[in-house]
């Protein structure tokens, strides 16, 4: 049989290369997977902390604004004005002058004025009390006789100085009767000394016959009044006389007599 002839063009037989394809060379700058995940986790935590920080800042800013609004409302309610030399109130020079003359704490006088007239010289009640400290006609006339004011007229009580002078004299009178106790003096200023004396004799109201805590006062307008006055007293001490620690301590104890008077031994003259 004829043998097949070989192709004139010899076939090129390519043998498979015995060389292996080298593996991809690792990037020396590439972080390990575990480290990448760790950094990602830390970033998430950091973002959470930053978010919490800004939320807290926003919360604190809001609270600070609320606090400042409340503070300004308090100052306005108590007629306190802020200044470079500290806080002040309307008629403060007159209040301090006659408080000193009659051995009273000026903060207590201010508390009475705030709750009687809200610092209005033209205030007049339905029962005829008049002026800053709301003095009744018969009481004012009696005081005029005691201090020797021969020119007294009831219309003079619209005058701030006259009203504060008369009111401070009367507070001093009540202070001597009730040992400078803020609750008793404010109660007597509102309801009369006879009423307070009667309460002191009632063991159900006063356990010692000398003092009456506000919460033991009989329910009614006088109890509410005494509570407001004593609260205002403490606030005026804090706002107007924060550095007078000895006097402020007296206010905290409910004493309306000035520390100067106590030191001089004339509180109950």
Give names to the regions the model predicted.
Residues 1-21:
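N-terminal targeting leaders characterized by basic, low-complexity, disordered sequences
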Residues 37-54:
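Hydrophobic membrane-insertion alpha-helices, especially the h-region
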């Amino acid at each position: 049989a004829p043998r097949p002839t070989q192709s004139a063009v010899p076939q090129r037989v390519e043998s498979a290369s015995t060389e292996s394809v080298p593996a991809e060379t690792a990037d020396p700058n590439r972080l390990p997977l575990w480290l990448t995940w760790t950094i990602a986790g830390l970033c998430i935590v950091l973002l959470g902390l930053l978010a919490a920080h800004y939320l807290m800042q926003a919360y604190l800013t809001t609270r600070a604004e609320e606090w400042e609004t409340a503070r300004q409302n308090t100052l306005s309610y108590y007629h306190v004005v802020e200044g470079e030399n500290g806080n002040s109130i309307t008629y403060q020079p007159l209040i301090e002058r006659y408080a000193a003359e009659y051995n009273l704490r000026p903060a207590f006088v201010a508390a009475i004025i705030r709750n009687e007239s809200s610092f209005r010289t033209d205030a007049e009640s339905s029962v005829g009390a008049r002026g800053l400290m709301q003095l009744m006609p018969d009481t004012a006339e009696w005081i005029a006789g005691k201090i020797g004011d021969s020119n007294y007229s009831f219309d003079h009580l619209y005058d701030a100085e006259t009203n504060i002078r008369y009111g401070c004299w009367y507070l001093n009178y009540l202070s001597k009767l009730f040992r400078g106790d803020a609750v008793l003096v404010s109660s007597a200023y509102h309801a009369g000394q006879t009423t307070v004396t009667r309460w002191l004799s009632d063991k159900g109201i006063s356990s010692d016959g000398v003092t009456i805590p506000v919460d033991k006062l009989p329910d009614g307008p006088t109890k509410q009044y005494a509570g407001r006055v004593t609260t205002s007293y403490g606030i005026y001490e804090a706002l107007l006389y924060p550095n007078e620690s000895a006097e402020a301590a007296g206010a905290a104890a409910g004493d309306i007599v000035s520390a100067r008077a106590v030191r001089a031994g004339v509180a109950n003259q």
